[in-house]
Amino acid sequence: RTIYIDNILLNTGTLPSPEFTCSVTTQSPDLNISEQLITIETIANNGIGNSSEFNMDLENTAFNGETKIIDFSCQTEYGFELLSSEDIEVGTVSAVDPLGPDNYGYYIYDSGDTNYSLVPSYDWIDIEDVGNPLNTVNDDDGNNQDDSQVINLPFTFKFYGEEYQQITVCSNGWISFGSSDLESFRNDHLPGPGGPSPMLAVFWDDLTADSGGAVYGYYDELLHVYIVQWNNVKTYEDNSNESFQAILFDPAFYSTPTGDGEILLQYEDFNNTSNGSYGGGTPLHGGYCSVGIEDHWGTTGLEYTFNNTYPRAARTLSDDSALFISTRKTGAVWNLAQAELELSNTDINYEISDDEILTENITLSNIGEEESILSYTISTS
């Protein structure tokens, strides 16, 4: 769509401003400005003036809430030069729009972003019976028992432009990329000084893994994903039950424009009950839980929720919610439906002599989950 703009300017100086001729350009994606010159008229001191009109084309791939930057390079007939820029926000952002991007280019899509192709669908992948218990993490059974464990990833995962072969999983609902000895339970803003950097806060809160709770890790070779699942863990303050998982997609198999890995967060049982106040004195930890991401400097990131408050683009989390974290703007969330092979004949051992031809019909069926894709290899020996 084409947008027409003229600027209203105020001269706060003590002298009249001269007439400027300005070129208008932009480096912002999804925004096109053909080479244009505008004129800013002479403005009296403490007076108001206008620029001439210019236009720009905004592509349909632009998201509500995104900030676009327009650059102005201006000069007068006397050789005076002025460089300036103007920020404009696209549309009006609401809970049905993605959160972001941050300064790196990450977005967080939630289940309510139904007008966008990358809207995630909740589809819990339970790894309790097949995953590896993270025994160090599972030692967190109460006050000051916080634990974290370093896990070797089965693939290289790129996050904020940095490549990692390990992650650190904490009992308190977060993952750090690389090795960390932190066990931070006091959740904070994202990005911010609290906790490790980089960080994926899945449900960062003061949690315990006692009373049947546990944390598991599992590599699904068929789906090319690594899953971390906090299963029936409890909030330390109110003993509320929480079950949630983070699914890391192998970037070598699931490509993105930046090469960064994508992440799906799923919440089977979500109870955001820790208000951070224990009755007098300094609160022991931040209010409620933190959900979001931050980079290795701790300066760039996206905060989906903290202290039970949400930005305009975020939908309130609840049971059976999903979040998808990506640098992509188009496409679809990867299909993680589980396939299952069924053969019409399982006795397929044959001996064939020289010059003999044997014909056999075998039917291969996918009896797995709806929309699953079955990959298979047939070999002979």
What does each of the following model-derived ranges do?
Residues 37-45, 140, 155:
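Beta-strand-rich interaction surfaces with strong enrichment in secreted/lumenal proteins
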Residues 58-60, 87-337, 367, 372-373, ...:
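Extracytoplasmic Ser/Thr/Pro-rich, glycosylation-prone low-complexity segments
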Residues 34-39, 54, 105, 153, ...:
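Cysteine-rich, disulfide-stabilized extracellular repeat modules
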Residues 12-20, 25, 29, 44-68, ...:
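Feature for long, exposed domains in two main contexts
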Residues 79-85:
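Beta-sandwich strand segments
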Residues 1, 47, 144:
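Acidic, glycine-anchored loop motifs typical of Ca2+
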Residues 5:
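Short, surface-exposed binding/anchoring microloops in extracellular/periplasmic proteins
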